[in-house]
């Protein structure tokens, strides 16, 4: 008797499982930690007429909040600040004369690298709403020197529980 056996091929892979064990009252919903806010096409004349665009919402969602020990969350935003418009984000790209601002749901300015906005924690899940907008400085508007092109900015946020 003759037995023929074909060779067996196998592929190996690796899986990394990771996380953080923390002493915080809430966890951050997956997807909240890395977001892209798409602003689309902004018409330059909108900035000359109104100095800024409409608000574009984005959300930070907290999950499974346990308020038995801590009752507030503080949110701060950090990034490269615009030179002409302090408190707003500087942009990268070919567009010039603009900066990106952030506002709270209540309409208060969340200044980059300084403002800490406080929220009362609710038990369970809670969504914090913020808005991004494009702004042009008074000098750029007066000189009609906005340059069209692509733009982007990177901002990080920090949650702390006092």
Where are these regions (language model features)?
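Mature extracellular/passenger domains of Gram-negative fimbrial/pilin and adhesin proteins
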Residues: 4-162
């Amino acid at each position: 008797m003759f037995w023929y056996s074909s060779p067996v091929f196998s592929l190996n892979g690796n899986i990394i499982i990771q996380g953080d064990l923390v002493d915080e009252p809430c966890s951050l919903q997956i997807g909240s930690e890395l977001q892209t806010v798409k602003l689309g096409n902004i018409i330059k004349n909108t900035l000359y007429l109104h100095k800024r665009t409409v608000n574009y919402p984005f959300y930070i969602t907290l999950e499974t909040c346990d308020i038995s020990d801590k009752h507030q969350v503080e949110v701060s935003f950090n990034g490269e600040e615009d030179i002409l418009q302090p408190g707003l984000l500087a942009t990268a790209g070919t567009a010039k004369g603009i900066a990106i601002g952030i506002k709270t749901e209540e309409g208060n300015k969340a200044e980059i690298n300084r403002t800490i906005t406080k929220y009362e924690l609710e038990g369970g899940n809670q969504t914090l709403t913020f808005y991004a907008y494009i702004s042009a400085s008074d000098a750029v508007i007066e000189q009609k020197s906005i340059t069209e092109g692509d733009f982007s900015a990177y901002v990080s946020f920090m949650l702390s529980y006092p």
